[in-house]
A protein has these predicted regions:
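A short, compositionally biased
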Residues: 52-56
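N-terminal non-globular leader segments, chiefly Sec-dependent signal peptides
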Residues: 1-50, 71-107
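Short aromatic-centered micro-motifs
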Residues: 59
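Short, isolated positions in well-ordered beta-strands
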Residues: 65-68
Length: 107
């Protein structure tokens, strides 16, 4: 029984979806997907909760495993800023969030 399970695991780990131009937002990955049976190639998706990242190349979510391609360049730059100047980076995050906040409809 273990041999069958190990073979299934090996097959599953080589057949996972790929995310490009991704970023991590509130515990979810957002990026352009390919090879996902539930989404068309080139679609932008929001994953379920990220449970683990393995060697910066694979992410396990509640529903699927993703191979990580290149991150979003703006998001990568923000991470570099956070390492070099956390206060400045927090101001940028606050500005980014205020720009991307959902519109509120006033009646």
């Amino acid at each position: 029984m273990n041999v069958v399970n190990n073979a299934a695991v090996a097959r599953a780990t080589t057949e996972h979806a790929r995310l490009e131009n991704w970023q991590l937002i509130r515990g979810h990955l957002v990026g352009t997907v390919s090879g996902d049976p539930d989404h068309g190639d080139g679609e932008t998706i929001h994953t379920s909760d990220v449970l683990a990242v393995v060697k910066h190349r694979h992410a396990h979510t509640r529903n699927r495993e993703y191979q990580l391609g290149s991150p979003d360049p703006n998001w990568a730059r923000l991470l570099q800023l956070m390492r070099s100047s956390p206060d400045a980076a927090l101001e940028l995050v606050a500005l980014h969030n205020s720009i991307h906040a959902p519109a509120v409809r006033i009646r």
